[in-house]
Amino acid sequence: MCIRDRFEMYSAENAGLVKFDFLGLKTLTVIDKTQKLVNEKDPNFKIDKINYEDQKVYDLLSSGKTVGLFQLESSGMKDALMHMKPNRLEDIIALVALYRPGPMSNIPIYNDCKHGIKEPDYLHPKLEEILKPTYGVIIYQEQVMQIAQALSGFTAGEADILRRAMGKKKRAELEKQKQRFVEGAFKNGISKDIAAGIFLKIEPFAEYG
């Protein structure tokens, strides 16, 4: 059942409703028309069956020739692509997530670790599995939640509360969550100083997450 209302999002959320943002993108129309044009010569072509490991695509992206590509066509993004030289879909996803105020400063770190210039810093051995796909850089809210669970024994529900506290930028709630994080990590044999340092790494999500 779908409920539509005119209340602002926080009031709706407090009432137990979930807010969804639906974007109307011209890009989707372009993709649909492109597939139809291709189908005139190749009836078997389907956009959802394309090869995500096609190296020619990544070579093109790495050259910065991305005019008309949604989220990849700004001059800054072209420059970022040429420095990153992506060779897998995960790189593109990471770059789009990183290319905004705050996390943008982590792009050079991601690139250096990706290309073997420096070793990834996983912050703690328990976090290597979580951060290995992103070369030690915390990029996604899901990673923040997994870190809280792995280090501090948060339940999935508690980790989601931490995520929401960061997303809403509520300082009082964030301080409460920091205390819970540090104490939970200490119970798991991790010093409070190390735990507090790791929390400092994830705290910027309160600014841009």
Where are each of the predicted segments found?
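Mg2+-dependent phosphoryl-transfer active-site scaffold
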Residues: 4-209
